[in-house]
């Protein structure tokens, strides 16, 4: 048995988290995915498997500028996902960090979403 890759380790952590974290219609799950270049956030109702709201740095018309760091872009995505969720009538969510450490871009997204009005 060889050494596991960082991706495999993250997916194992994510599976452990997903055993306990589930989104409901009253309190959907705020999921975060982080790639090397971009960050994605979705608010998901796991009972029906639907994405209710989404935001990312890859969307058309993204207002990010070249001088922003990836952490600052993540904070903008957090603010954007919170605004869209509040427009959709969602105020409470369960945060799913996706197996990533609660640090850096993931933390910036979560804190910006909290400041913009999401409760978790």
Curated annotation (Swiss-Prot):
The keyword Ubl conjugation does not apply. GO terms for molecular function: 5S rRNA binding; structural constituent of ribosome. InterPro entries: Ribosomal_uL18_bac-type, Ribosomal_uL18_bac/euk. It comes from the Bacteria. One of its GO terms (cellular component) is cytosolic large ribosomal subunit. The keyword Ribonucleoprotein applies. Keywords: Ribonucleoprotein, Ribosomal protein, RNA-binding, rRNA-binding. One of its GO terms (biological process) is translation. NCBIfam families: L18_bact (TIGR00060). This is one of the proteins that bind and probably mediate the attachment of the 5S RNA into the large ribosomal subunit, where it forms part of the central protuberance. PANTHER family: 39S RIBOSOMAL PROTEIN L18, MITOCHONDRIAL (PTHR12899), LARGE RIBOSOMAL SUBUNIT PROTEIN UL18M (PTHR12899:SF3). Part of the 50S ribosomal subunit; part of the 5S rRNA/L5/L18/L25 subcomplex. Contacts the 5S and 23S rRNAs. Belongs to the universal ribosomal protein uL18 family. This is Large ribosomal subunit protein uL18. The gene is rplR.
